[in-house]
Structures are given as C-alpha cells and as structure tokens.
C-alpha cells in the first residue's frame, strides 16, 4: 500500500484527532496567551516568562504549536498567541545574551522562522537570523563541533560536549544559509551532522546522548556520557527520536543520502523497541525492567521523523515507516491524550530524564504530536 492509500485508509481517525486538537487548542490559545508554558500544575499551564526562565530551551514550542495550528486552520486566535510569544522572548536578545545556548533553533526556528515563512514578517526573519548567528558562533573550529551547554552551575568542564539533540537545531543553519546566500551556515550544519553520524550513532541504531570531544584536536572523542538516559551505553528514547527526526531533516535540506540512511538505521532501532511495549515508548530502551518508565515525547518526535522517511522512500518500504508512525500515534492518543477542555495540556506521560521528571505533560510533547497529525493531514508546511 502506498503512502496516500494509507492516509486515505486512516482519514477518519486523522480528521477526528485534528478536530479534537483544534477544539481544545483554540480555547487554550486564548487562555494562555500571555504565558510561555513548559508543563501544567493542577491542569493549568505554568509559564517561563520571568527573569532568566525566558531563556528556557523549550520556550519556542508553545508559539511554535500555535503556528502549526495556524498553518492548518488560518485562525487568528493561533496567530495572535504565536506573535505574543515572540514578543515575550525578545528580552532574551536584550537582557540575557550570555544565557543563550545551542538550543536557539528550538527557541526561534519553529517560532520566528515559522512566522516568517507563513506570513512574511520581516521582524520575525531578523529574530531567527540573530538566533542562527548565535548558533553558528558556538562552532569550535579546532575541535570541529558545535558546543552544547554553557558553563553549568556545577562548574563542570563541558567545553567539548556535544549532544544528539542538536541535530534538531541545525535546520536553522540550513535555512539561514539559503536566506542569506551564505554557505558558511550550511557547512557548519553539515559538519555537525557528519560528526553526529560518526560519534553519536551506534551500530545498532541507538545513540550516545553526550559525546565529549577534544576542544583543540579535530574529530577526537575523549569519552561518551549517559546524559539523560539510564547510563553510558543505554538507549535514551528521546535521544533516539532526536536522531531519527534530525537526520531525515538534514536529508531533506541537503539531499545527501547518507543522512537518510542513518535516519532509517535509527528508526529500525526505535520501531523494534516500541513494538515490544505496544508502541508506547519507554524512557530508555536499554534500562533495567523496573521501574517501568515511559516518555511520550519520544514517541511524538519519532512519529514526525517516521512520516518524513515514509514520504522520502515511498512504496512498500515507506509503508513500514508510516505504519509504525500511525501505530505510535494511535497508541498514545488512546492511552495518553487528555481531551478535557478545562485542562490545558494534551499529551501526558512525558519524562524529562531517567533520573527525574517522570510521567508529566511537557509542552514539546503537545508540539510534536500536533506536528505529526498536521503532516498526516497533508498540510504543506515543514516548520524545521
């Protein structure tokens, strides 16, 4: 069965979920217009707008979610809330420049970048370009990598750290390269993707969350760290999903087959892992059997990547990836989605990391779940 036939077969379910998303989010978009939520407390969105919290890496997802809904509905309630979110984040550039980090792609590409591509807003374009320049400035020329976090409060020497998550930030560099006609941005993105392919992705398709590099000698790995997973050598499911989606995005931006091949390799590991648990992703695929910890956000991110792989490869091979995406989304919608109108979050059972923050609603879960449904609806808008 080809891609379009599978979409037609599942159209009733896809349309039904989209209607529920629109019904709930159209209300929440107004209720939380002056917030930038991360999670909820007693069903009500919290907000990361005060002080340095405005630089939280997740702050682009609320406005980005609004742009997804605007792309699919053209309703002003979504556009107004997305624009308000951008305005609130302007203090990052005026008051907290030293706090900006590698996740500026998450913060602005799906927010300001989406705004510019959907509406042509020049101010939004400038915001996204500023963020792209910030990301490019983190490139270590000697070590040949983009540095991840800033100096932490523990004062750990992390100058050589890279993380797999950053595969989702480099699409901002591909965009800036095209927008400015400056290939420096793309070259750095490609170098990062090639590094991640070599140093983060393992033979079995699982990934190293953190890789420690020599800061003065190019392409030299010192060690790997467990990061947000169970430990060194484990398989943190959200890290796997960042790689799965991130590499197919690099393929879409460059048409380099090696990135699609890598994405498919990672996808095989993800699919085989979730098949064992009814398509509900565990927090870490290689952790001990107990405690049983899940992470819905990994499933939502992976579904987005699987849909893009399916469209890229087509045919019977594409059916394998699209079927997996649908199975994951349907399992999560049935078991983990909250459609109560008096509660603000949708996708439950997100987990921050193995050590803490388990089984809670997290804004990027709602974002990627909605993005996946938008893709299935056939809306021609890639926010990355």
Residue spans for each PLM region:
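Glycan-recognition and catalytic cores of secretory/periplasmic carbohydrate-active enzymes
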Residues: 1-384
């Amino acid at each position: 069965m080809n891609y379009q036939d599978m979409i037609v077969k599942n159209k009733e379910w896809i349309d039904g979920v989209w209607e529920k998303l629109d019904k709930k989010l159209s209300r929440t978009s107004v209720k939380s217009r002056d917030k930038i939520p991360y999670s909820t407390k007693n069903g009500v969105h919290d907000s990361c707008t005060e002080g340095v919290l405005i630089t939280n890496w997740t702050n682009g997802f609320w406005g980005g979610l609004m742009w997804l809904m605007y792309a699919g509905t053209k309703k002003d309630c979504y556009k107004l809330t997305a624009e308000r979110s951008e305005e609130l984040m302007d203090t990052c550039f005026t008051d907290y420049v030293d706090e900006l980090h590698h996740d500026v792609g998450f913060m602005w590409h799906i927010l300001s970048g989406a705004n510019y591509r959907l509406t042509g807003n020049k101010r939004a374009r400038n915001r996204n370009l500023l963020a792209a320049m910030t990301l490019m400035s983190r490139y270590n020329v000697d070590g040949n990598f983009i540095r991840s976090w800033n100096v932490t409060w523990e004062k750990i020497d992390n100058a050589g750290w890279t993380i797999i998550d950053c595969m989702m930030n480099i699409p901002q560099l591909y965009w800036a390269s095209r927008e400015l006609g400056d290939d420096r941005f793309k070259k750095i993105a490609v170098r990062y993707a090639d590094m991640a392919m070599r140093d983060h992705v393992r033979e079995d398709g699982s990934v190293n969350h953190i890789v420690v590099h020599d800061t003065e000698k190019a392409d030299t790995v010192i060690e790997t760290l467990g990061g947000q997973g169970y430990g060194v050598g484990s398989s943190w499911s959200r890290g796997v999903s960042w790689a799965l989606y991130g590499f197919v995005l690099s393929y879409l931006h460059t048409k380099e087959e090696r990135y699609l091949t890598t994405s498919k390799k990672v996808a095989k590991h993800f699919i085989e892992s979730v098949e064992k648990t009814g398509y509900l992703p565990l927090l870490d695929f290689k952790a001990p059997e107990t405690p049983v910890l899940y992470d819905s956000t990994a499933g939502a991110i992976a579904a987005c990547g699987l849909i893009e792989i399916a469209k890229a490869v087509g045919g019977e091979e594409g059916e394998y990836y699209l079927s997996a995406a649908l199975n994951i989304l349907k399992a999560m919608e049935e078991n983990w989605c909250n459609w109560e109108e008096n509660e603000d979050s949708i996708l439950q059972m997100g987990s921050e990391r193995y050590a803490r923050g388990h089984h809670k609603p997290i804004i990027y879960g709602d974002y990627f779940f909605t993005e996946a449904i938008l893709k299935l609806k056939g809306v021609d808008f890639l926010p990355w």
